[in-house]
């Protein structure tokens, strides 16, 4: 397209400016409920069935984070090979989910977990291990007990 035609089109579309009529730009506000209704109607077309009794869903990502759904609504259409999981999702690090998630990990995740496990003890030891200098400073902060306070309180009571 040549530059002259493009300049004419741009001049026609100009919004605002001195002496020109302003063209209102339409703004479409989408709400979550509208999106949810569209999603539910699409799922209804796929003939999904509700799956009851699922307490939690964990989706493990490659970067070591887990998308965790607690008490989700799970719908499935086996003919369309489609699963829909709706509910409140939380992104958590895999280390936070560790004891209960081990049975759900695949071979890929187990190798990445081993690497994480090798790094984790080093980080914990580096951050939590008190240095000998720190121990001495903590002792200096606590004053030594010089008097017996029990005798003073007994004298005040009499």
Curated annotation (Swiss-Prot):
Residues 134-150 have a biased composition (Acidic residues). Keywords: Methylation, Phosphoprotein. Residues 122-158 are annotated as: Disordered. The modification N6-methyllysine is found at residue 5. Residues 33-98 form the NAC-A/B domain. It holds the Pfam family NAC. InterPro entries: BTF3 (IPR039370), NAC_A/B_dom_sf (IPR038187), Nas_poly-pep-assoc_cplx_dom (IPR002715). The modification Phosphothreonine is found at residue 111. PROSITE patterns: NAC_AB. Belongs to the NAC-beta family. This is Transcription factor BTF3 homolog 4.
